[in-house]
């Protein structure tokens, strides 16, 4: 369970975050767009950050944001369901983190690949994935400064982190 540092003070020793980072890195390396560059930053006493830099063929610079840390499992799970083992039931996926914005990396890369497959001209895009959002993102300001040369001057931020009113439809939030 890749719990955020506020909920797992021994996150580094427990190794769950490193495992998730490794799995995410493997997935990105397999599916990332052509000519993209993957950056992984790890600084002592800070959670890691992942940036996928995708060159564009038109003006503009988009930052797509998401996270891969989780809140605690809480209580109230049905007997056949549990927080740490995903289960498909009635065409729905159950498990801790399934609807907790863990999709951001995959949705970002998937949407970029789909647009590229359709021949859509895209600006430069940087996908930024952090690992301490559920703890209030204490490491994000440091990395935003540290990685400024990768992130660049941003024209649009797409934040893949929100809520849902029910499980019957897709929800979008604009702020």
Which residue stretches match the model-derived regions?
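Glycine- and other small-residue-rich loops at beta-strand/loop junctions that grip anionic moieties
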Residues: 41, 97, 132
